[in-house]
Amino acid sequence: MVVKTIRVRAYASIANLGPGFDVLALAIDSFYDEVELKVKKHEKTKILVESILGPYGTGIPKDEKNTAVAAAKEFLKRTSEKAYVSLRIWKGIPVGKGLGSSGATAAATVVGLYKVFKPNIDYNELIEIAAEGEKVAAGSPHPDNVSASILGGLALIYQRKPLRAIRLPISVKPKMILVIPEISTIKEKTKMARSLIPKQVPLEKVVHNLGRLAALISGFILGNLDLAGSGMFDDIIEPARKPLIPVYFRLKEKLLKMNVNGVCVCGAGPSILVMVKQNYKSCLLYTSDAADELD
């Protein structure tokens, strides 16, 4: 039987962007993961991680807790395929920093398998499969990050069951600064961050977030970064997670006074995104100085 080899790259992503909790994510080209798959059809299924390399490969499991392994199993199960799958993973996305690292690995894996087997499924199901794979790292499936890694650009999850996602057109390419704190990663960070979210939310806060989300999306589509940046505010999730990101609110206050377009937490944190449209070098220095002051 023929062994097929394919290598797939999946880029980092930033989920939520302020008010878009669990529905919005943006792919960025600052970091990426790569997965090389060697696939051979067989009577039995076996998935093996040969190696995990790259600057952020240390400590990543090779067993079923690896999102690539979990995603591959889910793909083969849904498509009723059986195969030997050998994986070589290159981790180029910082782990546990809110940049979609686990989701990118899962996304690259399912896209690779899709190109090998060419099953009759669409990208919505591919996103579902990758999200199921990410469950081993995050505790539950999160399609926002994987949708951005698979679709690219600005991805919107507009329906959950069945999952429906779309890549939104962006009329502008803003310059972005990432603040990545050099702190130890909390074990099961995403699960802990979700546990802080309130079960009940006042209607006023929901209305506020909906308005901000509309401004954020409209700004990107219309090419209006001031409008997009005005949408990067969240009255529900970010305040609830304040214990995990104590520096964020003080840093955001400082940066907004420097006329940056927008500031938000990347996913569950701790990384912070700063969006600017002009004076990029000055904003970069301001951001660095402000972060140092709060260190």
Located regions from the model:
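Short, conserved charged micro-motifs
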Residues: 44-46, 280-285
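A short linear hydrophobic-aromatic micro-motif
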Residues: 258-264
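Active-site-proximal alpha-helical scaffold in enzymes
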Residues: 103-121
